[in-house]
């Protein structure tokens, strides 16, 4: 730090909390702020980006369903959010598969969550496995430098199983009002 601030939290921070009200009850959230961008990561749902704010202004679409911790049909729980990761068995509405897959509903195991003078850094793993079947580990790293306009998301998929596995992956980005409004270009 350069002497003008006594605590890094004056310019950047990471806070963890659990939602306690209504259908959001039980959602675990990482509330990250780099001084210019604020982003809420949903630890309960694949470390997806629930909401993104730029200089205090929301840029994410949130559906009328809002956020939910409950396991209910897709049409009743699709929340939108800035980033909704679809997969790994399916991304569409194929017969026998859930719309957009099940990955988004898998909880993340946070391996690291820290804020340093370089920036906000979160690392997590999401396991997708079954007895006598697939054993995939989805690793996500989220980084944003202090004072930056950018959010970097790096994903790696590791197959820890004995056989090759097919997978599909779709990044569903949901931009909303006020960024997406009449006259937007």
What are these language model-derived features?
Residues 1-152, 163-166, 175-185:
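Surface-exposed acidic/polar loop and edge beta-strand patches at domain peripheries
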Residues 169:
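Aromatic- and glycine-enriched beta-alpha-beta binding-site module
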């Amino acid at each position: 730090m350069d002497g003008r601030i006594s605590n890094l939290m004056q310019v950047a921070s990471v806070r963890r909390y659990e939602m306690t009200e209504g259908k959001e009850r039980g959602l675990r959230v990482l509330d990250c702020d780099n001084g210019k961008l604020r982003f809420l990561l949903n630890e309960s749902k694949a470390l997806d980006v629930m909401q993104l704010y730029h200089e205090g202004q929301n840029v994410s679409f949130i559906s009328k369903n809002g956020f939910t911790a409950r396991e209910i049909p897709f049409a009743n729980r699709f929340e939108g959010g800035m980033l909704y990761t679809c997969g790994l068995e399916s991304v569409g509405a194929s017969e026998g598969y859930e719309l957009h897959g099940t990955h988004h509903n898998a909880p993340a195991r946070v391996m690291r969550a820290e804020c340093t003078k370089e920036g906000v850094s979160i690392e997590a793993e999401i396991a997708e496995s079954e007895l006598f079947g697939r054993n995939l580990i989805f690793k996500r790293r989220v980084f944003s430098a202090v004072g930056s306009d950018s959010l970097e998301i790096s994903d790696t998929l590791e197959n820890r199983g004995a056989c090759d596995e097919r997978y599909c992956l779709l990044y569903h980005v949901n931009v909303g009002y006020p960024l997406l409004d009449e006259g937007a270009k």
